[in-house]
Amino acid sequence: MAEISRIQYEMEYTEGISQRMRVPEKLKVAPPNADLEQEFQDGVPNASVIMQVPERIVVTGNNEDISFSRPADLDLIQSTPFKPLALKTPPRVLTLSERPLDFLDLERPLPTPQSEESRAVGRLKRERSMSENAVRQNGQLVRNDSIVTPSPPQARVCPPHMLPEDGANLSSARGILSLIQSSTRRAYQQILDVLDENRRPVLRGGSAAATSNPHHDNVRYGISNLDAAIEGASDDMTVVDAASLRRQIIKLNRRLQLLEEENKERAKREMVMYSITVAFWLLNSWLWFRR
């Protein structure tokens, strides 16, 4: 009802202005003075200026003058329709209570080009080392058929020593993997030292020639193959560690949100309890003073 009355009032107000409003014929700057006005009219005839409202206002001559032609941009602006813009009020409070961290997903992450490339590189390294190992073993078999070499003594390998910093890194998968790599490299170096000491020259055709030990080569190629396999496994472990870290971050975030909500509820309960306690003591004090 109020809206209808307001609209009716606005219509009547607009209609009244349109009917009663008049343009004045003269505009006076100073307050009226009879003597001054009489002198001014006697000295200067037709001193007053009649005010007229033009029917239209033309911009730059309306192409009548070449030097002051109508700009084409004005016609383009007037002919181009403008679409109304709709604005939406942003929310006052932004919370994560509905679905926290939508950009983190508990599902298995999609394989990225970097992870796929690292896996492909590890796979190529393993295949290359296996093929080289097979080719060299075949060459060693042919060489053993043509060359007679004495059987080397049994190499005695010392167990790899563990450094004190290796024991501190056993709490994570990366530490265990680094421990395996370091122990493998130390064992490989010890085997090479022992085999270099036991290598002897072999006589062939009256000349002394130092030939490579097939057992030594087999051990070298086997350990290189193991190193390549461990490198490929480290790439896979990196991808698995990233996925597990993401899951742990999501769990920690949710747990933190639950703790924050519990703290807020506990603060509200404490405020209510404090208010009740203070009111109780004030009431008791007032009753005691009245007695």
Curated annotation (Swiss-Prot):
Compartment annotation: Mitochondrion outer membrane; Peroxisome; Cytoplasmic vesicle, Secretory vesicle, Synaptic vesicle
Region (Disordered), start-end ranges: 106-134
Sorted UniProt keywords: Coiled coil, Cytoplasmic vesicle, Membrane, Mitochondrion, Mitochondrion outer membrane, Peroxisome, Phosphoprotein, Synapse, Transmembrane, Transmembrane helix
One GO cellular component term noted in the UniProt record for this chain: mitochondrial outer membrane
Gene Ontology terms, MF aspect: protein homodimerization activity
Protein topology in the membrane: Single-pass type IV membrane protein
Primary localisation category: mitochondrion
UniProt KW Transmembrane keyword: yes
InterPro entries to which the protein is assigned, alphabetical: Mff-like_dom, Mff/Tango-11
Hydrolase found in the keyword field: no
TM regions (residue ranges): 272-289
A Pfam family recorded for this sequence: Miff
GO biological processes: mitochondrial fission; mitochondrion organization; peroxisome fission; protein targeting to mitochondrion
Coiled coil location: 240-271
Mitochondrial intermembrane side: 290-291
Purpose: Plays a role in mitochondrial and peroxisomal fission. Promotes the recruitment and association of the fission mediator dynamin-related protein 1 (DNM1L) to the mitochondrial surface. May be involved in regulation of synaptic vesicle membrane dynamics by recruitment of DNM1L to clathrin-containing vesicles.
Family: Belongs to the Tango11 family.
Subunit structure: Homodimer. Interacts with DNM1L. Interacts with C11orf65/MFI; the interaction inhibits MFF interaction with DNM1L.
PANTHER family: MITOCHONDRIAL FISSION FACTOR, TRANSPORT AND GOLGI ORGANIZATION PROTEIN 11
Protein name (record): Mitochondrial fission factor
Source organism of the structure: Mus musculus
Protein's gene: Mff
